[in-house]
């Protein structure tokens, strides 16, 4: 009953924290000093940033820059950043490049001149991760970093890759339930399989039709990946998306499709998973492993489980403030 009356943000502690936790837990990032980055570096780090996660983003990216700052920082506005957000970002990373969503959309539509690709790109915000870093073609290597992430130690393997190049890579979510106790799936989820499941079930046929060798590793997560600027080819991407649209229709315009397509492209071109004991997606089942992690991705409804995310962020902010 109350779910029909109350807004989603007030329907429980999880929705409330996912809506307002940015200001509650991460605002003290404002007290940390700026970090100089390199706008001409061979590797760039790209994040899609929303107004309501701007503090969390600064904690995430500065937790990386604390260990390695010889990198170009691209902040992709999801369309909600305001003037104060932009000022805040520039105050903490003076050399960061902020990409205005409306402007890059105009550029993309004009330069690529492909209505179908433009439709896919604009259908869901996370698709900006798939299209825009490649469209910008800055330097030699691309890192994608979600805003709900933390580096707890120096990511040595990633730093070496950023300096010297190498094979593409990604991080993993563990297999099994994300929660310690599973609940019954909703009728909607039972009726409509996730797009990634549909693609996995049809992968052999998909490869035969396209003459490709796409693969998709179980647990692939696009929230922290690295690859060369020429790995994503828009001609190949159009062929893949056209085939997927013919099979699955508007499902390719919804949540999860961008990650699945990123997975096909990277895994199909030899990407390797970072060691899951060091780089992983946080769940209720692996919460005890955080103390030994290098990188943790705090996704969805598990983000504030046991409040480890804000506690670790608070420690990082203290370290940054003293640096």
How should these model regions be labeled?
Residues 109-121, 184-188, 290-294:
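Short, surface-exposed amphipathic charged segments that create phosphate/polyanion-binding patches used
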Residues 151-188:
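Conserved donor-nucleotide/metal-binding helix-loop-beta segment in metal-dependent transferases, i.e.
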Residues 1-42, 198-323:
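A glycosyltransferase accessory/donor-loop signature
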